[in-house]
Swiss-Prot record:
Reactions catalysed: pseudouridine(1915) in 23S rRNA + S-adenosyl-L-methionine = N(3)-methylpseudouridine(1915) in 23S rRNA + S-adenosyl-L-homocysteine + H(+)
Gene3D superfamilies: 3.40.1280.10
Source lineage: Bacteria, Pseudomonadati, Pseudomonadota, Gammaproteobacteria, Chromatiales
Residues that hold S-adenosyl-L-methionine according to the record: 102, 121-126
Keywords: Cytoplasm, Methyltransferase, rRNA processing, S-adenosyl-L-methionine, Transferase
Localization annotation: Cytoplasm
Family, as annotated: Belongs to the RNA methyltransferase RlmH family.
Domain of life: Bacteria
A GO term from the CC aspect: cytoplasm
Protein name (database record): Ribosomal RNA large subunit methyltransferase H
Gene field: rlmH
Subunit structure: Homodimer.
Molecular function terms from GO: rRNA (pseudouridine-N3-)-methyltransferase activity
EC numbers, comma separated: 2.1.1.177
Length: 154
């Protein structure tokens, strides 16, 4: 199962790289978590043009055959078991999924329209760099649930 994390922003802080790599390396045989970074659209406060530029870059970075899940505070809330069930289903259907993380100004309409699903990690607004670590941990947690590993405790 190939899981792509397609995210806005280059050069994340060390704690973000370390967190992402920690969980990516823990995944068991047959599961890979790959990071694809795209450049930010510019600097500005809620700049719609910057969001559109980021959206174009995100869309170009998406693997063509992957199920695409946009991550957005307005998306559908999903608990850990729902993450695990979805990943399990997608692994049986072809084994590729892309989680899309926008930049500081969120996701463009084009990205939302391309997405097969839109999920929320929290009703809180989260820093996009922190979301990378949260997604990596949830992917690992889902794998442990599906593998019978004792990491997840209900």
């Amino acid at each position: 199962m190939r899981i792509h994390l397609v995210a806005v922003g280059h050069k994340p802080p060390r704690w973000v790289r370390d967190g992402h790599e920690t969980y990516a390396q823990r995944l068991g045989k047959g599961w890979r978590l790959e990071l694809h970074e795209v450049g930010a659209g510019g600097r500005g406060n809620d700049d719609p043009q910057a969001r559109e530029r980021e959206g174009e870059r995100l869309l170009r970075a998406l693997p063509s055959r992957a199920v695409c899940v946009a991550l957005d505070e307005g998306g559908t809330p999903r608990d850990t078991r729902q993450w695990a069930r979805s990943l399990e289903r997608w692994s049986h259907e072809g084994g590729e999924v892309a989680f899309i993380i926008g930049g500081a100004d969120g996701l463009s309409d084009a990205v939302r329209q391309r997405a097969d699903a839109c999920w929320s990690l929290s009703p809180l607004t989260l820093p996009h760099m922190l979301v990378r670590v949260l997604v990596a941990e949830q992917v690992y947690r889902a794998w442990t649930l599906l593998s019978g590993h004792p990491y997840h405790r209900s």
